[in-house]
Curated annotation (Swiss-Prot):
Binding site for Mg(2+) 2: 447
PROSITE patterns in alphabetical order: BRCT, DNA_LIGASE_A1, DNA_LIGASE_A2, DNA_LIGASE_A3
Major localization listed first in the record, in broad terms: nucleus
Protein name from the UniProt record: DNA ligase 4
One Pfam family here: DNA_ligase_A_C
Biased composition (Basic and acidic residues): 817-838, 891-904
Top enzyme class: ligase
GO cellular component entries: DNA ligase IV complex
Length: 1025
């Protein structure tokens, strides 16, 4: 058995070993199946175009499945040549081409050829520059296609898929050799059409824009493809290991392997309140780790060999060293490993440690430090911070708990300060434990915290509530920070013209039933500030589609009135991205489907590290509102100062939360005397609300009473006549207290003149207690043609007899129309979709395989469904008037304490948005000048006092010229504290003094100039002192 190499007795710079150096093993692949030929690249282009324009997700899956099936039938079972072109970003064999837009533009100008003053040459070189006339600006492949189409004489392309792969391999092999690459690209130019070249360039740039996620491609290719890719990050291995769709992997095949990059577990995005994070831990003690500002790294070691790779599978062994005689890290950490270790895999964060200042340096300095071969003791150096042990001596530890893995980790490694260390961790039990650690992190300019459940398993590529990150902005009441999905956009004008300049964002509507085919999104907010010019170039390169008011996107729910959430263009969810948005507060609005929007919203960052699955949900919006309302009530209860006398306006509820006026409905019988009912409308019915009101009138006319809410301890009978289970009804059913009866019971009771027996046929959902009642079991079952109950729907879905989301055959046919356009015979066969059967896909959505919660603590960590009864509370059981969410929000807005209260941001109560032309309007700044510091009893440094004073005079002018206000430290409307980097000694003191009632932004004075230069408000975190 190979033993680890002993620690070197001499310095790392001494002569290296003379024995043969171990070579990193090349991946082993199974023998690929043999194809009988290839296919024209043109048929793959047709698939790309179909996928890019098809609006229905299920239809895209069927198109992909039909294409794959035809390839297997006609060409063979080796789909690797196709997968490389569908998922170029996952192709490790062609990791880098060394060709970006600028190089491609110059190459094409030469090979077309174009004169340097030719308008099209200028257009290629300035493809990013937006203009009113050029709507394709920002999308280089499209610009190139338009330029080539004017000059290319190729009517029909002759390249095959195999030939294109050979060409791309040649380009990758000749990276850095522009002349050779230019000759190779000429083959593409001479043998493919302009449209085909557009897609080839997209493949080279690894930015396909085909509205299909990798998870969809993997799920259609093979049910186990995603799981296997998570363990190896190797597209070729997935293609050749799983070429047979009928062959399934066993559990061992899905385990991680030494020297194979895997997709690591990720943190779930921050919850709205720290208390929610604690609740997600299920009452258990939890582990608190500091979130580090480095690069996620996995370290593999077997004997003398080392392997380092990033979260996305990039090999960094060349930097850190594959043995003790190479690299900037391995020579210094080899002695840290216990001699009993044969092989091991660690998960951690690679940082830069500066031994002079004794602190970690910013992430941007990592590569410089890693490349430093000087080995000088005082130079910054890589330091690997380990937080997990995943593999040990041939055994995978993924199914072991965090606590088990951490305990064993400390027996495997002896830390070497500044080289390899453990992440600092603490035990927590309450929200205050987290706040205490967060205060320390903020004072030390840290990133945040990670909270881990001690019983959590390690889920490859998973993101669940076992690991939750907590960031400072989610605990300090600095306003609302959300992650929303960009769904539409409006074109700008003037200096913001030339493309999309305002983004319309939405949240995922999780109130809808789980059985819906595709997720729906509810419009929530529009953003017009916060993004830089470079951000807008990227945003405008997205595959925007024209918004048709008569046929709006099906996935997006918008307000019935108003134009605030209607765009000029829109993005399919698969092509879109998550935007981190910060605002002063969430406020009522009838201009968005949510019924709420954000006040003073601005973009903080494009979250390219998040997927659309990380989008905020409607329930989280309501929970945030409830939390904020509770906070305000607690603040109000603690205020002893006199409040201004105010009149609370009577606010009408939204229609869906209100009932009919029953005062004028006469009571005719006492059939339902003493009985209370809550009637739910059918969201799928156009007359749902009207039917609900008529049913309530019938109940009232026959002696019953109606309520708008289901109280926890109420004996109310719930009435519902729909075919699906709306989210609010699901919350009621999940409590297991209330039966859900069909409206037919009401009508039959009225016909009988007395309450009808509670037979099974009348139930949409029956409680466990009800199912044992004699009356319930008198009936044999549902009548012919009746709507299945919620329980039966759930059984059918689980057993596979009904596909989740399906309703009727007619609707299925509507949702998957035939391909009507004419195609030649051969091409038609490639895209022929059999609408009678779905692709052979897993029963769950493709995202489930990477996020399924199979942890030991699943039974305790599941968060209880939020109780939203408060949002539907009305004053009288049979009256229209009440106090719902809108009323509550309005009351808090109108009742304002004189002092120490919750002060609204903005120059007026009515102001809602920033002014893009006067960027600091509505903001208030305190300048930490020497004079102001002394006036507030804080010490100053005299060395730069004069220069700092002069600098702040210039900053003050810039702020005022751009609409901002200069205020004192105790101004309630204070938003920003500005410091000078030459003297930030008062940072912690200013942080403490301005933390109530909510924290303010502390920024360096550079922030002011940077915002003015970009013409927008930037993220304050980038300028924190």
């Amino acid at each position: 058995m190979m033993q680890p190499t002993p620690a070197p007795s001499s310095a790392p710079g001494s002569p290296q070993r003379t024995q043969a150096e171990p070579e990193m093993e090349t991946p082993s692949y199974p023998q690929p199946p043999q194809n009988v030929g290839t296919a024209p690249f043109s048929v793959l282009v047709k698939l790309f175009e179909k996928l890019a324009t098809e609006r229905k997700q299920e239809r895209r899956r069927k198109l992909l499945d039909a294409w794959f099936r035809h390839w297997r039938r006609e060409k063979g079972f080796d789909l690797y040549p196709v997968l490389r072109l569908l998922l170029p970003q996952k192709d490790r064999d062609r990791a880098v081409y060394g060709l970006k837009e600028k190089n491609l533009a110059k190459t094409y100008i030469k090979l077309i050829p174009l004169g340097m003053r030719d308008p099209d040459a200028i257009r290629l070189l300035n493809w990013k520059k937006p203009t009113e006339r050029d709507k394709s600006s920002g999308d280089f492949p499209q610009v190139l296609c338009e330029v080539v189409s004017k000059r290319s004489s190729v009517i029909e392309g002759t390249l095959t898929i195999d030939e294109l792969n050979e060409i791309l391999d040649d380009i990758a092999k000749n990276m850095g050799k522009s002349d050779v690459q230019s000759k190779i690209l000429r083959r593409i130019y001479n043998n493919s059409t302009a449209d085909e070249q557009r897609w080839i360039i997209r493949i080279i740039l690894k930015d396909m824009n085909i509205s299909v996620k990798e998870t969809t491609v993997f799920a259609v290719f093979h049910p186990d493809a995603q799981d296997l890719y998570n363990t190896c990050s190797d597209l070729k291995k997935v293609a050749w290991e799983l070429w047979d769709p009928s062959r399934r992997l066993n559990a061992k095949d899905k385990e991680i392997q030494i020297f194979h990059a895997f997709a690591p577990m990720l943190c779930k995005r921050p919850t709205r309140k720290i208390e929610e994070t604690v609740k997600a831990m299920g009452g258990s003690k939890f582990i608190i780790e500091e979130k580090l500002d480095g690069e996620r790294m996995q370290l593999h070691k077997r004997g003398n060999e080392y392997f380092y790779c990033s979260r996305k599978g990039k090999d960094y062994t060349y930097l850190y060293g594959k043995h003790i005689g190479a690299g900037s890290l391995t020579p210094f950490i080899d002695s840290a490993f216990d001699s009993r270790i044969d092989d091991i895999i660690l998960d951690g964060e690679m940082l830069v440690w500066d031994p002079v200042s004794e602190r970690n340096l910013p992430f941007g300095t990592l590569k410089t430090a890693a490349l430093d071969r000087s080995k000088k003791e005082n130079n910054p150096r890589p330091c690997f911070k380990v937080f997990d042990l995943l593999y040990l001596n041939g055994m995978s530890l993924l199914d072991k708990t965090v606590k088990f893995r951490k305990n064993n980790l400390r027996h495997c490694i002896k830390p070497i300060p500044g080289r390899i260390e453990f992440v600092e961790e603490y035990q927590g039990e309450t929200a205050n434990d987290i706040r205490k650690r967060m205060e320390q992190v903020m004072e030390n300019r840290g990133e945040g915290l990670v909270i881990k459940h001690p019983k959590a398993k390690y889920i490859l590529n998973g993101r669940n509530t076992d690991w939750i990150k907590v960031k400072p902005e989610y605990m300090d009441n600095m306003g609302e920070t959300v992650d929303v999905l960009v769904v539409a956009g409006n074109y700008g004008s003037g200096k913001r013209g030339g493309g999309v300049s305002t983004l319309i964002c939405a949240v995922m509507d999780d109130r809808r039933p789980d059985s819906d085919d595709e997720p729906k999104y509810s419009s929530f907010v529009r953003i017009g500030t916060g993004l830089s010019f470079a951000d807008y170039v990227w945003v405008r390169s997205k595959p925007w589609k024209v918004w048709d008011p008569k046929n709006p996107p099906e996935f997006l729910q918008t307000a019935k009135k108003g134009q605030e959430d209607k765009g000029d263009v829109y993005l399919e969810p698969e092509d879109s991205f998550i935007l981190k948005v910060k605002a002063a507060e969430i406020t009522p609005s009838d201009q968005y489907h949510m019924g709420f929007t954000m006040r003073f919203p601005r973009a903080l960052a494009i979250r390219d590290d998040l997927s659309i699955a990380d989008c905020m949900t409607a329930t989280e919006v309501f929970e945030s509102l409830k939390s904020e309302r509770k906070r305000k009530m607690e603040d109000d209860a603690g205020i002893t100062t006199k409040k201004r006398k105010t009149t609370v306006k009577k606010v009408a509820l939204l229609p869906e939360y209100s009932g009919p006026n029953l005062k004028k409905v006469a009571v005719k019988t006492d059939i339902f005397n003493g009985m209370k009912f809550v009637v739910f409308s059918d969201p799928k019915s156009r007359t749902g609300e009207a039917d609900k009101k008529e049913l309530m009138k019938t109940i009232h006319a026959n002696g019953g009473t109606c309520s708008q809410i289901v109280n926890k301890n109420s004996e109310a009978i719930v009435i519902y006549g729909g075919s699906i289970t709306p989210y609010d009804l699901k919350l009621v059913i999940d409590k297991g207290i209330h039966d859900v009866i069909k409206p037919s019971w009401i009508t039959d009771s009225v016909t009988l003149g007395e309450p009808a027996p509670f037979k099974k046929k009348y139930f949409f959902h029956a409680t466990e207690e009800r199912k044992y009642a004699d009356e319930y079991n008198e009936d044999d079952g549902e009548e012919e043609g009746a709507v299945p109950s919620a329980d039966e729907q759930e059984r059918d879905v689980k057993s596979g007899t009904v596909e989740p989301g399906s309703e009727t055959e007619d609707e299925d046919e509507e949702q998957a129309p035939e391909i009507k356009e004419e195609q030649d015979g051969e091409l038609h066969e490639w895209l022929k979709v059999d609408d009678r059967k779905s692709p052979a896909l897993p029963a769950h959505d493709e995202e489930d395989s990477v996020t399924e919660d199979d942890s030991d603590n699943a039974d305790v960590a599941d968060e209880e469904e939020p109780d939203l009864d408060d949002w539907f509370q009305v004053k009288g059981e049979t009256e229209d008037e009440g106090a719902g969410a809108l009323a509550t929000a309005s009351r808090h807005r109108e009742t304002t304490p004189d002092v120490d209260g919750d002060v609204k941001m903005g120059e007026s109560e009515e102001a809602m948005d920033y002014d893009p032309d006067v960027i600091f309007k509505h903001l208030c700044f305190y300048l930490d000048s020497p004079a102001n510091a002394q006036r507030h009893g804080m010490a100053t440094r005299p060395k730069y006092e004069a220069a700092i004073t002069k600098s702040f005079e210039e900053v003050e002018k810039l702020i005022k010229d751009n609409g901002g206000k200069i205020v004192d430290l105790d101004e309630p409307k204070l938003t920003h504290v500005v410091l000078d980097k030459r003297d930030d000694s008062r940072r912690v003191e200013l942080m403490k003094r301005t933390s109530k009632p909510r924290r303010r932004h502390l920024v360096l004075s550079d922030y002011i100039e940077a915002c003015i230069d970009e013409g927008t408000l930037l993220d304050e975190e980038e300028f924190a002192p």
